[in-house]
């Protein structure tokens, strides 16, 4: 795997607050290798290690994308939701930024059925067919469509399980992470000082609560994904 330059610098990471962890009482001892200090009751992440892990992860993401691998980005908490959607749209990959529906991956046949229903309803709406139905039936189907859009809108073009899943908050998305582990789908996780680095395949120690921190990490990963995808298109 070729090492590339992703313009990752410590000053930018500090400005984004990537180094701020949780209170020292909430830490996971397994995060000790990634923590450099305690400050005012808060653990401080070692940014030198974070920068190295992020750079290595970008190399891996580029390599996977250049081979046509499919990505799913997951982040459902309010601070991450919009950033996840923007990042995924930019990278032209799938995303979940609202509630993770249990079994979304492990019970893929059910998810696939819902996606078919979602696509059919969208097609009927675009064709104006819903307006031809009795008001009560039309209203019911529109509510159904709205519900599906909220929870499945980011994966509406997914035709199979993803090859790699990027998870913004290990604690918040634990169900999604467990499904990936069950299915053997590789995961890339942002891990704060209260997380377990052993649960994910690739871990990036970082503040997963600050918008600026989440944005910075996602931007780097998406840049690698976009470059890899462009390489795949050129060489196809």
Curated annotation (Swiss-Prot):
PROSITE patterns from the UniProt entry: RIBOSOMAL_S2_1 (PS00962), RIBOSOMAL_S2_2 (PS00963)
Gene for this chain: rps2
Keywords carried by this UniProt record: Chloroplast, Plastid, Ribonucleoprotein, Ribosomal protein
Entry-linked SUPFAM superfamilies: Ribosomal protein S2
Biological process annotations from GO: translation
Gene3D superfamilies documented for this protein: Glucose-6-phosphate isomerase like protein, domain 1 (3.40.50.10490), Helix hairpin bin (1.10.287.610)
Native organism: Piper cenocladum
The keyword Ribosomal protein belongs to this UniProt entry's keyword annotation: yes
Pfam family, one: Ribosomal_S2
Subcellular location: Plastid, Chloroplast
Gene Ontology terms: cellular component: chloroplast; mitochondrial small ribosomal subunit
Domain of life, source organism: Eukaryota
Family: Belongs to the universal ribosomal protein uS2 family.
GO MF term set: structural constituent of ribosome
Name listed for the protein in its UniProt record: Small ribosomal subunit protein uS2c
């Amino acid at each position: 795997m070729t090492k590339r330059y992703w313009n990752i610098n410590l000053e930018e990471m500090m400005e984004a607050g990537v180094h701020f962890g949780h209170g020292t009482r909430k830490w996971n001892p397994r995060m000790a290798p990634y923590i450099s200090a305690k400050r005012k009751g808060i653990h401080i992440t070692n940014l030198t290690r974070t920068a190295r892990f992020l750079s290595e992860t970008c190399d891996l993401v580029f390599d996977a994308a250049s081979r046509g691998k499919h990505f799913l980005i997951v982040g459902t908490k309010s601070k991450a939701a919009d950033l996840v959607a923007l990042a995924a749209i930019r990278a032209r990959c799938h995303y979940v930024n609202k509630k993770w529906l249990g079994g979304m991956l492990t019970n893929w046949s059910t998810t696939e059925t819902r996606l078919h229903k979602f696509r059919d309803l969208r097609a009927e709406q675009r064709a104006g067919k819903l307006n031809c139905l009795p008001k009560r039936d039309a209203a019911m189907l529109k509510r159904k469509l709205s519900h599906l859009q909220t929870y499945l809108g980011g994966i509406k073009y997914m035709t199979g399980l993803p090859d790699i899943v990027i998870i913004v908050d290990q604690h918040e998305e634990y169900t999604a992470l467990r499904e990936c582990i069950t299915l053997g789908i590789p995961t890339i996780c942002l891990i704060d000082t209260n997380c377990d680095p052993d649960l994910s395949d690739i871990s990036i120690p970082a503040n997963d609560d600050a918008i600026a921190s989440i944005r910075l990490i996602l931007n780097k990963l998406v840049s690698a994904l976009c470059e890899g995808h462009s390489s795949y298109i050129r060489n196809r």
